[in-house]
Amino acid sequence: MIARILAALADSMEMPVAAGGGSVLGTIKIAVMPIAKVFTMCFLGLLMASKYVNILPPSGRKLLNGLVFSLLLPCLIFSQLGQAVTLQKMLQWWFIPVNVVLGTISGSIIGFIVASIVRPPYPYFKFTIIQIGVGNIGNVPLVLLAALCRDTSNPFGDSEKCSIDGTAYISFGQWVGAIILYTYVYQMFAPPPEGFDAEEENLALKTLPVDAAPEQVPLLTQNFPKDFSPTQDLLPVQSTEPRGRGVSRKGKIAQIFVFLYEKLKLKQIVQPAIVASILAMILGAIPFTKKLIFTNGAPLFFFTDSCMILGDAMIPCILLALGGNLINGPGSSKLGFKTTAAIIIGRLVLVPPVGLGIVTVADKLGFLPADDKMFRFVLLLQHTMPTSVLSGAVANLRGCGRESAAVLFWVHIFAIFSMAGWMVLYINILF
């Protein structure tokens, strides 16, 4: 009996899939293995943070998060994107940032519909829209692609080319995600006049959600004196001292630039990963600097090689930190079971099919590079990811960090299963 079952399983592995030429179980293996690797490393991080081992206490996880987002992730993006990008490729990749914007718009519309049906507790209507509408287009896709490309049997061919192309595509869209996060999301998380929680108003800038990246908060919150006004010293000040017309004009121009810098929140947008992406695109698009920095044997290739070595450490470090952050559990939340479940279903079940439709239409219209399956796979992944982790830092700044932490916890738990299912579908469609 056991022999017959094993024989049947072996036969099923050889059965071709209708959408492609692979086997049923083979396709499932390709899609599930990266998720299994991610889950294993997160579990080890959870174990290291447990009270029985306690190698990753909260202070250690905070330092690890800071190291990842301030050094390791920018190094990975700079080395991989710089090697892959050219001016011609940047023109071919124009739909990647457009896809991020379309994904945010479509996700927000779905979030609005879900919130209108579920009616979350006041004042979490806009909060629910954002939790459904804005996905993680950075570190989680990078982790999944790294795990997928390491497998020599991956459907995208050569492991090194798979990794470089995938990282380049994902990194190319990150700068748009950062702008969306610190403009649209920041405004949508604006608290009501009475605040999300009157008792915690004074603590809103002092605590972090368990899944937030602590190193991001200094980019959002400044340690100003209590009597400091955000517009202080930004507008022209009338002085009794005589000054020339030229000095006055220069001073006003400088003050206008400073005012715009603060008003547009450029300090929040210009994060290390975004700076690395912009530098890689500029230096990689210019033939002279590309040959000088990113080509094997180039005079400055030692710098790129050093970034590659540091970048290789990003994946395990971020997964250990993410697993360690889960040790505290979801925490308390005022959203309730119905709203939390609606966010999970909206983000992981309703958003991906709409994203699949967007990518399919773009492909039919000829907006995507011909015969580049990795390009299409990355576009689909952008619609499949759980809620953005960095939105937790913005939510914390706005006073709803506790609710955001609870949502991030449950969404990432269920995303382990949903991402595997959607990846099976995508691989069958593409191959």
From Swiss-Prot:
Membrane topology summary: Multi-pass membrane protein
Ranges facing Lumenal side: 1-29, 88-93, 150-169, 290-306, 362-376, 428-431
Keyword Chaperone assigned: no
GO cellular component, one term: endoplasmic reticulum membrane
Top-level lineage group: Eukaryota
Protein's UniProt keywords contain Disulfide bond: no
Induction profile: Up-regulated by auxin application.
Tissue-by-tissue expression: Expressed in seedlings, rosette and cauline leaves, stems and flowers.
Pfam families in the cross-refs: Mem_trans (PF03547)
A GO biological process held by the record: response to auxin
Transmembrane segments: 30-50, 67-87, 94-114, 129-149, 170-190, 269-289, 307-327, 341-361, 377-397, 407-427
Cytoplasmic topological domain: 51-66, 115-128, 191-268, 328-340, 398-406
UniProt xrefs under InterPro entries: Mem_transp_PIN-like, PILS2/6
Keyword annotations of the record: Auxin signaling pathway, Endoplasmic reticulum, Membrane, Transmembrane, Transmembrane helix, Transport
Subcellular location: Endoplasmic reticulum membrane
Protein family: Belongs to the auxin efflux carrier (TC 2.A.69.2) family.
Function description: Involved in cellular auxin homeostasis by regulating auxin metabolism. Regulates intracellular auxin accumulation at the endoplasmic reticulum and thus auxin availability for nuclear auxin signaling.
PANTHER family, sorted: PROTEIN PIN-LIKES 2, PROTEIN PIN-LIKES 6
Protein name per the record: Protein PIN-LIKES 6
Gene giving rise to this polypeptide: PILS6
